[in-house]
Every structure is written in C-alpha cells, then in structure tokens.
C-alpha cells in the first residue's frame, strides 16, 4: 500500500465488505463482472484444466500461461493491435500469468460469519466492545441460544420479555410448534436474531464515542468509591476498572483507524490468489495440494448447502437452517485458525490441516521466512563474537564475507585504477587474493556502512548500521554494548549483514541507523546501551581486588597460627610488601612486566583534596622514619607528613584494575565534554 506521502507500507487490519469486493471483482472487456467463487472444484479430472467459477478459475484469477486462454488461443501480451484482449468463448483475458499471484476472489456467504480472531483470541475484541461474557457470545454465534434482543425498534413480544431468555428453555422448542413454517420464518426474521447476524446487528448499533464516555464515567465512579474491605469485591472492582480501560483504548483505536465494529463479522470471504495455495504435480502423476484449498472447498460446500436450504426448499425446518449456519461458521473458523475452538480438524491420514493462521505465523510463516527472512543479494551471515577493542559504531567483518559483499565495488576499483582490463581479469585477481585487492577493499569499506540484523526483528533496534573493518577469522566482531538492542549474546547467535546500495539507503544508514545514535529505547526511553552479562562480570573482576584488607600486613597469611584448620603451603603464599607508585603509568608498567597482579593492592600517589578526608577519622597505624617523617595509614589512603605535620603527599590504596577502569571513565568524560564544546 502507498499512502499520500508515497510511503510504501504493509498494514494488516479489518476492511469493509465494499473493499473486499473492490479487491476481488473485475470487469472483463465484454462488461461481465467476475470474481465470485461459487464452485468447490479445482481442476477437471479429464482435461486437467481449472473448473469455471472454481478455486482456480482462469476467468477470475487470470491465465495459467501468459497470453494463453482456457481454449488454447494465444495473443501477444501488450500488443494493442491484437483484438480482442480476451477470449470471447471462455472469457479469459490475455494477460501475464503473474496476475495469479495477486488477483483475489471472494465467496459470498449466505449467512454472516464472525471473524474468529476477534471473537476467540484473548482479549476478545467483540466481547470487550459489547461488554458481554465471551461464553454468552459464543453460544449466540454457534446457535446454542436462539433468542436474542429484538432487532426491531417496535414494542414486540420478545422486547417485553427482555433479552437472552435462559430460564424458560422450553421456548426454544415450543414456539416453532405454534407457527407454520412461513409464519415462523416471518417471526424469526423479525424478532429472533441468532448466529453471527445477531452480533453484527449489535455491533452496528454501537456508538464508539458514547462507549468511551460511559466507560470513563463508570471508571471514575469506581475510583471514587474506594476499598470496600471485602477482598473479593475489591478484586472485582480492580478487574472491572482494567476492563474499562481496555474497552476505551479499543474504541479509540477503532475511531482513529476509521474501522467500523461490524466489519468483524464477515459477509464476503476473500479467496487467496492461486499461486499462494498451489496444487503441484509430483512424481508418479500424483497431485499435492495446499491445505488451504481443502478448507476453502469445505466452506463452499457448506455455504452452497445453506443456500439451497433457504432458496429451493421452503419446507426446511428452522432448526436445520440454524444447524447449517453453525456448520458454515465452523468451516470459516477452521479456514482462518484451525484448532482455536478446541480439537483441530484433520485429514484422512490424521494430519492436522494448516489454516491461514498457521501459514502466516511463526518462524516458518509467510512473513518471517519468506518476506522478512528471505535470502537477498549482497548479504551474508555468520556467528557473532565480542570485539572489546571496537568502537561503538564499528563492527568487524571477516575477509571472506567482506570480499563477497563488496566484490562489485572492488572490481570497479581495479578497472578504474587500470589494474584489470575487464571483469574477468578482476575476478581472477580477487580469487588469487592479491595484496592490491585488500587495499582497494579497505578504501571501499571506509565509505560504505553495513547493516547488521538479528532475527527476530521485533523492533527498530533489531537492525542497525555499522562502519565495517576487516578482521581475521570467520566470525563477525561486535561491540558488547549494542547487544541489548539486538537481544543478542555471544553463545552462538548469528547475525545477517547487508550492504545498502542506493544513496537513499546509505544516507538513512548514516543519519538514522548508526548504533551510536540509538542509545535509548524507542519504546520507554530508557538507556539501552548498558553493560550486560560478560561486561558486568568483567567489570566486577577488574575492580574486585584482593580480599585482604589493610590489616594484611599485621595478619600475614603465611602465619599458620591464623589458619589453624587449614593447611598452608609456603610456596603458594608469599608475603610481599604493598608497592608504592608515583603515577598510574608506572603501575601499568609493573603489571605488564608481571611484577604485580591485576588485583594486587598498591599505593598510588594521588592529588586528593584533603577536605575529602574525614577530620574525625583516626589512622589505623602510624609509621615513623628516622628523620622524623611519619606515615598515617588509613583504610583506603596514606598521608606522608613531616615533623612539622605538613602534608608531603597522599597515596590511595587501589589496584591496577581500578586504575584502568578509572582511566577509561575519565577519557570517556573528556571526550563527551569536547564533543559538547564543539556543538556549542
């Protein structure tokens, strides 16, 4: 569908019977209107040709072979000199056979039928709008209750008795005895509303704006009453308030989308194009058909039977008509969603029929497998691994994938630089993996983003753009902070990478889809690029440090008296004095030289404001030197003072892990400050 702003989009929702008729009907050149499927047949068993007005009719859905009608005549497609443009004998137009992929038909239902998605799925939209129990509506739809509110506005017999008479069940059997067949039909059509027709009449009488106003008034009244003290009654009030909120939201959605509630009851049933429910001939001359065809046949059989009961036979009992209407309703339910009402329908081999819902839903459905997850050109797939050295907006592509994705660009670069005379020579150089190929590939990748997608794509952050760089191996490297948007982790997840080709796609990838521009959740606005799983464990290990406190000097771990119940090996526990460092670079150098460990405690000289130090804090130890200087040792810092109590310097007790983490935070803050200063 293309809207007025020329945006191509796919919208799934309710449509009016007029819209279904407009989609399915067409006027052939002789003025005849075709589109209604009236026969439950597919192909003739002798001629092996589609039956007229059947599920594969060429008059309705188009020719099987382009330019060839059902009679076998041939016309050139698009030739204006060819006249006529359709076969006068069979009525088939001379058009392309691809029309059978999108040309729809329809079945005109003799009785209205409720759409099972909106009746049985939870929450039930029909039950919410009508504010009635679902079981009550099901009994009405499937003709278990035959008395409904009168559809006429005149004072009648049933209006005096009220609606939905359950107490006097004998009425269901006694009233037909007092009327002749014709009289009962008149009475039934006027005063008794049953089946989906009763639902449609009630939905048509709804005023959505009044529903919103009344629901809001009732919700406010329930809120003003307050708790009753009875737990059961309070729960009922809470459930009622939640129901009113859902009802108001549903009514607002119907108003906002210009959808009428009675459209949830079907009068015209669309028939899918034949190419979407094919019949295929396999080895041995056997035919393999889609289950949708059998379900359509069942609907047409039962609908035609109901038509015959109402038109050809006037002496048909009303109970038989109601029973046939129930069968039509059940057949349409099975077509739309098999098994939603309980036991699914099976074929002769005890295999469950695949309904329309089964075809489109799930991982192997039409949308996720054929449309969203289909194989496309200029794309690849591989396992993702962590790339801790990558920037947030970069990803690492394996050479094997990158050369395939950007092969056309590399070929163009080789020819432009006169390194290859034609495409064949350029491809041979790529196969030989010459060094110049990787240089050109690097140049191409610098100005071309790629899109990474992880299925299922449940929201817009499921596909983001990155600046690719070449990496060794056969896995895609990814920054761990972007994993939450993809709902991915590094336990074997796979991602697909795509190359945006058009200038519009590249501009969209750079301006809207880069990972560093999607830091907040589009749903709730919370930060989505936050550390998770491996990063949290790594930060904990980096900053945990040793469990020994400042008193480790006093309580030496190699002293066996401190561990009476444990066996201490002197080779494993060697007491070393905590070293002093003037700056963080010396500490990192000592770590790289393996003189200290990542979690080894050390003293680092630090420019710390003395006002941070609590004045009432008492040092744990004081070490005096021979010249009078002394060290005041606290839990987390050390102060060197002179004889005159002047502060020479301050050391903090930390680890190499703490230092590395602090430097990363400091560099990030400085980079953010510089970026803000550039913007201002």
UniProtKB/Swiss-Prot annotation:
Keywords: Chloroplast, DNA-directed RNA polymerase, Magnesium, Metal-binding, Nucleotidyltransferase, Plastid, Transcription, Transferase, Zinc
Coiled coil segments of this chain: none
Catalytic activity: RNA(n) + a ribonucleoside 5'-triphosphate = RNA(n+1) + diphosphate
Location in the cell: Plastid, Chloroplast
Sites where the protein binds Mg(2+): 489, 491, 493
Binding site for Zn(2+): 69, 71, 87, 90
Major location (coarse): plastid
Top-level taxon: Eukaryota
Protein family (similarity comment): Belongs to the RNA polymerase beta' chain family. RpoC1 subfamily.
Subunit structure: In plastids the minimal PEP RNA polymerase catalytic core is composed of four subunits: alpha, beta, beta', and beta''. When a (nuclear-encoded) sigma factor is associated with the core the holoenzyme is formed, which can initiate transcription.
Physiological role: DNA-dependent RNA polymerase catalyzes the transcription of DNA into RNA using the four ribonucleoside triphosphates as substrates.
Name of the protein this chain belongs to: DNA-directed RNA polymerase subunit beta'
Organism field: Crucihimalaya wallichii
């Amino acid at each position: 569908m293309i809207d007025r702003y020329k945006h191509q989009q796919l919208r799934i929702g309710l449509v009016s019977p007029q819209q279904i008729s407009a989609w399915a009907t067409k006027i052939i050149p002789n003025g005849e209107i075709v589109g209604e499927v009236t026969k439950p047949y597919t192909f003739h068993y002798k001629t092996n040709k589609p039956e007229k007005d059947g599920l594969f009719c060429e008059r309705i859905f188009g020719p099987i072979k382009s330019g060839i009608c059902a009679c076998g005549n041939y016309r050139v497609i698009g030739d204006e000199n060819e006249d006529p443009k359709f076969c006068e004998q069979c009525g088939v137009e001379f058009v392309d056979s691809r029309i059978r992929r999108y040309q729809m038909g329809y079945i005109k239902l003799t009785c209205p039928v409720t759409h099972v998605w909106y009746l049985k799925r939870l929450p039930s939209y029909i039950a919410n709008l009508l504010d009635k129990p679902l079981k009550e509506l099901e009994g009405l739809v499937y003709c278990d209750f035959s008395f409904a509110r009168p559809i006429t506005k005149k004072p009648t017999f049933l209006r005096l008795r009220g609606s939905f008479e359950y107490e006097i069940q004998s009425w269901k059997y006694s009233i037909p005895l007092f009327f002749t067949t014709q009289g009962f039909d008149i009475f039934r059509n006027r005063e008794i509303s049953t089946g989906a027709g009763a639902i449609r009449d009630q939905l048509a009488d709804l005023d959505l704006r009044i529903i919103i106003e009344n629901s809001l008034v009732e919700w406010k009244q329930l809120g003003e009453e307050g708790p009753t003290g009875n737990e059961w009654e309070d729960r009922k009030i809470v459930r009622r308030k939640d129901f009113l909120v859902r009802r108001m939201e549903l009514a607002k959605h119907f108003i906002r989308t210009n959808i009428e509630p009675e459209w949830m009851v079907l009068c015209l049933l669309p028939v899918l194009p034949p190419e979407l429910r094919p019949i295929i001939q396999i080895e041995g001359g056997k035919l393999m058909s889609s289950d949708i065809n059998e379900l359509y046949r069942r609907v047409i059989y039962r609908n035609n039977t109901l038509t015959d009961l109402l038109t050809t036979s006037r002496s048909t009992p009303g109970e038989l008509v109601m029973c046939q209407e129930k069968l039509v309703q059940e057949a349409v339910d099975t077509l739309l969603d098999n098994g939603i009402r309980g036991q699914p329908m099976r074929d002769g081999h005890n295999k469950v029929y695949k309904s329309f819902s089964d075809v489109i839903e799930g991982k192997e459905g039409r949308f996720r497998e054929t449309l969203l997850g289909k194989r496309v050109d200029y794309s690849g797939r591989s396992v993702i691994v962590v790339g801790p050295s990558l920037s947030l907006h970069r990803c690492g592509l394996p050479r094997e994938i990158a050369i395939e994705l950007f092969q056309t660009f590399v070929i163009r670069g080789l020819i432009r630089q006169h390194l290859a005379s034609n495409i064949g020579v350029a491809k041979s150089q790529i196969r030989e993996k010459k060094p110049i190929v990787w240089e050109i590939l690097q140049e191409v990748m610098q100005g071309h983003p790629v899109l990474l997608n992880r299925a299922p794509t449940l929201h817009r952050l499921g596909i983001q753009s990155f600046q690719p760089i070449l990496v060794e191996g056969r896995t895609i490297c990814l920054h761990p902070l972007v994993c939450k948007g993809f709902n991915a982790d590094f336990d074997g997840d796979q991602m697909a990478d795509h190359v945006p080709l058009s200038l519009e796609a590249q501009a969209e990838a750079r301006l809207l889809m880069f990972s560093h521009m999607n830091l907040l959740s589009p749903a709730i606005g919370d930060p989505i690029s936050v550390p998770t799983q491996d990063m949290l464990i790594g930060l904990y290990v980096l900053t945990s440090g040793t469990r020994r406190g400042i008193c480790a000097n006093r309580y030496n771990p190699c002293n066996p008296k401190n561990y009476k119940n444990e066996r201490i090996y002197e080779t494993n526990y060697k007491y070393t004095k905590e070293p002093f460092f003037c700056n963080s670079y010396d500490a990192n150098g000592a770590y790289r030289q393996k003189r200290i460990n990542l979690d080894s405690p050390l003293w680092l000289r630090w420019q710390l404001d003395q006002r941070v130090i609590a004045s009432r804090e008492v040092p744990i130890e004081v070490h005096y030197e021979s010249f009078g200087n002394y060290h005041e040792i606290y839990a987390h810092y050390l102060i060197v003072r002179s004889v005159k109590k002047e502060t020479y310097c301050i050391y903090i007790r930390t680890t190499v892990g703490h230092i590395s983490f602090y430097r990363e935070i400091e560099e990030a803050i400085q980079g953010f400050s510089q970026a803000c200063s550039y913007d201002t």
